[in-house]
Amino acid sequence: MTTPNFSIDLTGRTAIVTGASAGLGRRFAKVLAACGAKVACTARRKDKLDDLVAEISADGGTAQAFALDVRDAAQLQAIIPAVTESLGQPDILVNNAGIVDAEHATRMSIELIDDVLDTNLRSVFILSNEFARPLIARKTPGRIVNVASIAATSYSGGGAALYSTTKAGVVRITETLAVEWSKFHINVNGIAPGLFATDMADGMIERAGDFSVHFPRKRLGQPEQMDSTLLYLVSPSSDAVTGTVIKIDDGQGSR
């Protein structure tokens, strides 16, 4: 009998998750830890990270909290050495941190424009490079999972034009770095979620109403519905998969 090439055992691996204090990032950190990875949980809200680390530890996992403002290039440059010293060289990176602008373009302040660009796009490119550089030097393979959005390819005009633009940029970063780093066995892939039940979604619903009534299945996605895709993209099973962005939207968006 042929044994399927599939494993979710991440023992011996070290992962970094940005934006881990809430929402999808929090779920991603817990799932990676549950499968054996040592997880560096990063975000600006250190108090919420401490709670997350306590939960992971109580479940038998290994995690550590690192305060990180992804808008600050110096902090992005410092985080890889800090994680390496505490948990070992990271070989999994989940670029999850992101904010939504929820504004029509002409109403956005320069400060908000900078925040959205720096958080959603610039940080992904900088941190991916900081992550890849030591792996390339050591000739060690790695996995990057970038969190994009179905907004990368679809925008209704109701607000969040810049968010949509940055997520399209995340898709292109995923594709271009995958090509550039394929020879180093660093796989770069992405997940493009629809609207999932998170703090960010709660805020959008509070401002604009319940979007789910317009969806074919009349529901929001649940973060746990992404577990298998995340694990696939960081496991040996996806060894030949790079430069791919997987849409997970429960049929919410157009095709």
Regions from the PLM with identified roles:
Residues T2-S7, L231, T242-R255:
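Short C-terminal tail/terminal secondary-structure segment
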Residues T14, S21-A22:
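Conserved glycine-rich cofactor-binding loop
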Residues Q89, S182-N187, V241-G243:
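Short, small/polar-rich loop/turn modules that mediate ligand/substrate recognition or access, typified
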Residues H104-A105, S109-L117, F211:
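Substrate-binding pocket helix/loop in short-chain dehydrogenase/reductase
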Residues S128, T166, T174:
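Active-site helix of classical SDR
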Residues R133, V179-K183, D239:
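Alpha-helical segment proximal to the catalytic Tyr-Lys
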Residues S149:
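Residue(s) in the substrate-gating loop at a strand-loop-helix junction
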